[in-house]
């Protein structure tokens, strides 16, 4: 590892030792952060996979019901039944902090038209129970869909932060800290050499003075 280009003085040695202490402490903190991020990320990915499977299974069930509804209803009645939604939905996206990562938090409000509280935007005279089942399941799936979007975005952001933290940890571990250690070692060696040279000169001067005396 190449050393830093600095003057081999005691002042520089003191500065570098402080930098090494700070870098070592930063490395430990970042490594701890990386480990905790990985732990939370793995848990979130497991939950994301479970939630995605539930959503996909529920959507598959809704699709089967819709196919059955199309089979027993005319296209005209089917289109008229679902063209005007009964429900209005608004979504508010906020943030929360997870290990210095800002991840999204989605809150949504649902408002049904009319006072009866029915989710079906049609009467039941010309529709089928399969269509009722389709809309009922989709109504229940919506919160899961929004949660899935929130969780998957959180996974993406945490993965980015893990990669960024990993690069910083590696830079400290394999470049900054070894460079500082090598430079400190070099300065100490040079200072020791200078001290030995100074001692040798003093001994020679002392010897010369004694001989003249």
From Swiss-Prot:
The keyword Ion transport is annotated on this UniProt entry? yes
Q: Which InterPro entries match?
A: V_ATPase_D (IPR002699)
Q: Which GO terms describe its molecular function?
A: ATP binding; proton-transporting ATP synthase activity, rotational mechanism; proton-transporting ATPase activity, rotational mechanism
> What UniProt keywords apply to this chain's record, in alphabetical order?
ATP synthesis, Hydrogen ion transport, Ion transport, Transport
* Example GO BP: proton motive force-driven plasma membrane ATP synthesis
The function of this protein is: Produces ATP from ADP in the presence of a proton gradient across the membrane.
Entry similarity comment: Belongs to the V-ATPase D subunit family.
Query: What name has this protein been given in UniProt?
Result: V-type ATP synthase subunit D
Provide the species name: Clostridium botulinum (strain Eklund 17B / Type B)
């Amino acid at each position: 590892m190449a050393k830093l280009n600095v003057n081999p003085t005691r002042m520089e040695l003191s500065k570098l030792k402080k930098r090494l202490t700070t870098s070592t402490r930063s490395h430990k903190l970042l490594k701890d952060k990386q480990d905790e991020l990985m732990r939370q990320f793995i848990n979130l990915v497991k939950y994301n996979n479970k939630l995605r499977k539930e959503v996909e299974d529920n959507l598959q069930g809704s699709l089967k019901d819709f196919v059955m509804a199309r089979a027993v209803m005319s296209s005209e009645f089917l289109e008229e039944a679902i063209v005007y939604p009964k429900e209005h939905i608004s979504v508010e996206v906020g943030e929360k902090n997870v290990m210095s990562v800002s991840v999204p938090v989605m809150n949504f409000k649902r408002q049904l038209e009319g006072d009866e509280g029915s989710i079906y935007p049609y009467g039941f005279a010309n529709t089928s129970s399969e269509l009722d089942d389709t809309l009922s399941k989709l109504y229940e799936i919506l919160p899961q869909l929004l949660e899935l979007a929130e969780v998957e975005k959180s996974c993406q952001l945490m993965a980015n932060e893990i990669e960024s933290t990993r690069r910083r940890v590696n830079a400290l571990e394999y470049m900054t800290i070894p460079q500082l250690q090598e430079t400190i070692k070099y300065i100490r060696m040079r200072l020791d050499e200078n001290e030995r040279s100074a001692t040798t000169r003093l001994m020679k001067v002392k010897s010369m003075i004694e001989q003249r005396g």
